[in-house]
């Protein structure tokens, strides 16, 4: 019996249910050593056990390697952004952005999206019955939820890299007018910082509901290094994010594929 094979057997949701069902007690139920010893498991050959273990190890290795790459790269990005505040004067972004108010009147855009406070587009919580009034966010534009009340002390803003989509008519949409001065991804990295969340909340106005309006967005100040430096920082971030995504996919696959392999071994 391979210890790692046994560990993978224990990781299965089926074993969680088995252990819960076979726990005994009144105020506190326990899965005793005796219950553990009475657990029945299928025992394929050690070679078959090792095949499953090797697949699990491969996914875990991919996950750990890419996590090790992503962490320092993310730290480099953050440190660069911090340094920029001291090296370059802060400038308002107003002269370089333009508000967009294109409505989906002909229903040509069918993809409806919301925006999470994690700064990404997501499936909407609800879709308007009359989507003709929804605003269109074109590829390369920014969308944001003007309302900052009851939003986890954050502002929901995202940069659209996928296909054109629509958002609620209550949202704001804008684009950068000169990408030779501001790299869109660089601006997105800046507004994704916790410091910007605090700034947006502080500058929001209203009574029962507070809003961060477009005129306040125009007054946001950021350091503007040469475009080559902005793009270099963005490229580092993209490398870090790619490594992070690979790690997450490997982790997800290890949770999906390995139980399936184990199930195959059990029933073969």
Protein language model features and the residues they cover:
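A short glycine-rich beta-alpha junction/loop motif
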Residues: 1-4, 24-47, 165-170, 205-231
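Hydrophobic alpha-helix feature that most strongly marks membrane-spanning transmembrane helices
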Residues: 11-14, 101, 148, 192, ...
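Non-catalytic DNA-recognition/assembly elements of restriction-modification systems
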Residues: 38-104, 223-268
């Amino acid at each position: 019996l391979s210890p790692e094979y046994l560990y993978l057997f224990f990781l299965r949701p089926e074993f969680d249910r088995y252990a819960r069902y076979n726990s005994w007690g009144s105020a506190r139920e326990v899965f005793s050593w005796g219950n553990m010893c009475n657990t029945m498991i299928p025992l394929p050959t050690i070679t078959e056990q090792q095949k499953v273990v090797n697949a699990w190890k491969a996914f875990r290795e991919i996950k750990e390697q890419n996590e090790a790459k992503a962490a320092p790269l993310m730290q480099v990005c953050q440190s660069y952004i911090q340094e920029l505040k001291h090296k370059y004067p802060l400038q308002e972004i107003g002269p370089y952005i333009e508000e967009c108010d294109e409505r989906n009147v002909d229903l040509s855009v069918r993809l409806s999206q919301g925006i999470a406070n994690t700064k990404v587009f997501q499936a909407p919580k609800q879709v308007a019955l009359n989507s003709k009034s929804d605003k269109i966010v074109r590829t390369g534009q920014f969308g944001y939820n003007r309302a900052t009340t009851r939003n986890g002390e954050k502002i929901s803003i995202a940069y659209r890299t996928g296909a054109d989509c629509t958002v609620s008519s209550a949202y704001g949409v804008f684009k950068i007018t000169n990408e030779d001065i501001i790299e869109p991804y660089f601006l997105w990295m800046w507004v994704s910082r916790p410091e910007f969340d605090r700034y947006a909340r502080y500058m929001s106005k209203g009574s029962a509901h507070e809003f961060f309006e477009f005129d306040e967005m125009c007054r946001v100040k950021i350091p503007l290094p040469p475009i080559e430096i902005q793009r270099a920082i963005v490229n580092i971030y993209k490398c870090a994010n790619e490594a992070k995504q690979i790690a997450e996919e490997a982790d997800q696959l290890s949770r999906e594929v390995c139980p399936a392999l184990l199930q195959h071994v059990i029933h073969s």
